[in-house]
A protein has these predicted regions:
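Conserved RNA-binding domains used in RNP assembly and mRNA/RNA metabolism
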Residues: 2-98
Length: 98
């Protein structure tokens, strides 16, 4: 089994590398996009966040930023223990309901 070392600096908080990044986050029950502006305990605080009700074709969502159904919610928090996976979001964050 392969081991990946994220940081050897004990002063670096876990997941700190994601601070100020825009992400598409999937949990078991919902999906969000937003910019990580703070990491507190087990939570990402997201700015300009949206709940993604229907991502559509996943490749188009990630590569082109095309989402079928999205609800901008502003600020949101997601428990990092609930995250199943996440992807860089290299697009503008949604501003309108679709």
């Amino acid at each position: 089994m392969k081991t990946v070392i994220v940081s050897t600096d004990s002063n670096t908080p876990p997941l700190a590398e994601f601070l100020n990044q825009k992400l598409f986050i999937r949990t078991l029950t919902y999906h969000l996009v937003g910019k990580v502006v703070a990491i507190t305990d087990n939570f990402f605080e997201l700015e300009d966040a949206s709940w993604v009700a229907d991502s559509g074709r996943f490749m188009q969502a990630i590569k082109e930023g095309k989402l079928n159904e999205v609800e901008p919610v502003g600020r949101a928090w997601v428990n990092t223990d609930a995250i199943t996976d996440m992807f860089p979001w290299d697009h503008d964050l949604p501003k309108t309901q679709k």
